[in-house]
């Protein structure tokens, strides 16, 4: 379960992972933003994927913000593979990536009420909550972890 760098040929698999998590974890309206991110930022922003038996089943990135922080972005696991340790492996790899950069003093993320507990288990604390911030029924839970 070691992440590898995203390749442009992974786009279809990553969009399929996104689609498998709609509408509980992502709002349908977010798909265009994710697709645009994959086309424009995934390669230069060190986006990562995890493969199982040659199939991409998880993906996520780390966005360097330039203000002493880095942000976990677009982290997701194919819905049928939740609770198998893939999300944790991906999150830990991105945390190690951030911790290795001396310019990063804190890691931020925007998640939902559905995954807030997962990130709390990795040392993140809630900064604020915006009701329906990611879409109807999907609160934006802003979290951070100070290094």
Regions found by a protein language model. Give the residues of each.
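Active-site rim helix/loop that mediates acceptor-substrate recognition in acyltransferases
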Residues: 26-48, 52, 56, 61
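Conserved acetyl-CoA-binding loop-helix of GNAT-fold acetyltransferases
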Residues: 77, 83-96, 121
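Conserved catalytic-core motifs of GNAT/GCN5-like acyltransferases
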Residues: 108-110, 120, 125-142
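Conserved GNAT acetyl-CoA-binding A-motif
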Residues: 91, 98-112
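Conserved acetyl-CoA binding element of GNAT-fold acetyltransferases
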Residues: 68-80
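A short beta-loop-alpha structural element at the N-terminal edge
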Residues: 1-14
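Helix-loop element at the rim of GNAT/NAT acetyltransferase active sites that forms part
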Residues: 15-29
């Amino acid at each position: 379960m070691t992440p590898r760098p995203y390749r442009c040929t992974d786009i279809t698999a990553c969009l399929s992972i996104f689609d498998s998590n709609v509408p509980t974890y992502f709002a349908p309206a977010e798909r265009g933003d994710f697709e645009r991110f994959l086309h424009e930022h995934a390669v230069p922003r060190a986006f990562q994927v995890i493969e199982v038996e040659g199939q991409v089943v998880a993906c996520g990135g780390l966005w360097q913000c330039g203000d002493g922080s880095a942000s976990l972005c677009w982290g997701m696991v194919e819905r049928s593979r939740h609770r198998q340790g893939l999300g944790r492996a991906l999150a830990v790899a991105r945390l190690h990536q951030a911790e290795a950069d001396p310019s990063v003093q804190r890691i931020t993320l925007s998640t939902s009420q559905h995954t807030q507990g997962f990130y709390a288990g990795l040392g993140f604390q809630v900064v604020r909550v915006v009701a329906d911030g990611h879409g109807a029924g999907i609160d934006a839970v802003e979290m951070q972890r100070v290094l």
